[in-house]
């Protein structure tokens, strides 16, 4: 049994390194002043995406299609060195009962109704990962979004862009809500080759084996499955790919690189949680 497991893990490692060479290699990111001026990666762009998301129905949808191409590979020059680090010195983090060693507040943007009866209650996650951002970063972004801008792009649609979620029709996107959750930091990881949550920047490859960093074969297997199955513009560098207008960051973080959204984390499955609040995008962003 042990021999079989060893062989399986060896195969997983071999496959991963093959895929790493494919996915973490040669690509040009969309670093422009406006997403409407993105360079089109025609080599990687799936033109079926244009047909699936026509701009007559989905505003700025071509930028989403370009995002899929531009995040297919992760490169060193795409690394952002100001990721949110989960450390005690980070004063922007909200800790439960204001105790640094307690749970911290995160937010997920979801259309799932399973949280609705759990406000104020402790529960355990289902057998799936939950992609989240650290509160109040989403709120800090969407509050300054002006009424003039909202007439062109609705708040829910802009949040989809910010978080690298596909364009959605109004009947679907209007079912989404912001769920704020208390979670222990030990149950969080960053979806990058190095899942450590205390870092300000990500790695494009798995760290070399050392006495300080241990990347398990189980995590490598999870990462490989994401590479093969993920159909969102996943940067693999610890931040969401914002395919919306970069000018929206002008009031919040003018120096932010184009297409860099929010730092993203994942709550591992079977983690104990507590729902703090559930809000519509409009109420959350007041």
Task: Name the predicted role of every residue range.
Residues 2-12:
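Bacterial N-terminal signal peptides that target proteins for export
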Residues 17-27:
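C-terminal segment of classical bacterial N-terminal signal peptides
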Residues 28-33:
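Boundary of Sec targeting at the N-terminus
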Residues 34-133:
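ADP-ribose/NAD+-binding catalytic cleft of ART/PARP-like enzymes
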Residues 94-199:
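Extracellular-facing segments of soluble proteins and assemblies that are Gly/Ser/Thr-biased and enriched
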Residues 162-286:
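Conserved NAD+-utilizing ADP-ribose enzyme module
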């Amino acid at each position: 049994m042990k021999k079989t497991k060893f062989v399986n893990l060896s195969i997983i490692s071999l496959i991963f390194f093959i895929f790493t060479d494919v996915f973490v290699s040669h690509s040009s990111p969309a670093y422009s002043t406006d997403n409407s001026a993105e360079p089109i990666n025609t080599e990687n762009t799936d033109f079926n995406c244009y047909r699936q998301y026509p701009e007559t129905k989905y505003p700025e949808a071509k930028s989403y299609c370009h995002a899929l191409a531009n995040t297919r590979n992760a490169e060193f020059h795409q690394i952002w060195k100001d990721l949110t680090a989960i450390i005690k010195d980070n004063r922007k983090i909200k800790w439960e009962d204001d105790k640094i060693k307690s749970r911290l507040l995160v937010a997920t943007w979801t259309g799932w109704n399973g949280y609705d009866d759990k406000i104020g209650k402790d529960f355990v996650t289902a057998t799936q990962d939950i992609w989240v951002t650290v509160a109040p970063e989403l709120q800090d972004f969407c509050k300054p979004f002006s009424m003039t801008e909202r007439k062109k792009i609705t708040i829910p649609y802009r949040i989809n862009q910010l978080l690298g979620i596909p364009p959605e029709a109004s009947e679907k996107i209007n079912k989404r809500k912001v769920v704020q959750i208390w979670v222990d930091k030990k149950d969080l990881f960053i979806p990058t080759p190095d899942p450590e949550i205390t870092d300000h920047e990500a790695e494009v490859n798995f760290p070399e084996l050392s006495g300080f960093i241990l990347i398990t074969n189980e995590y490598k297997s999870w990462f490989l499955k994401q590479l093969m199955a993920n159909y969102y513009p996943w940067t693999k560098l610890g931040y969401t790919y914002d395919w919306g207008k970069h000018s929206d960051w002008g009031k919040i973080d003018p120096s932010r690189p184009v297409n860099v959204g929010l730092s993203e984390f994942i709550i591992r499955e079977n983690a104990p949680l507590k729902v703090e609040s559930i809000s519509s995008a409009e109420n959350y962003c007041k």
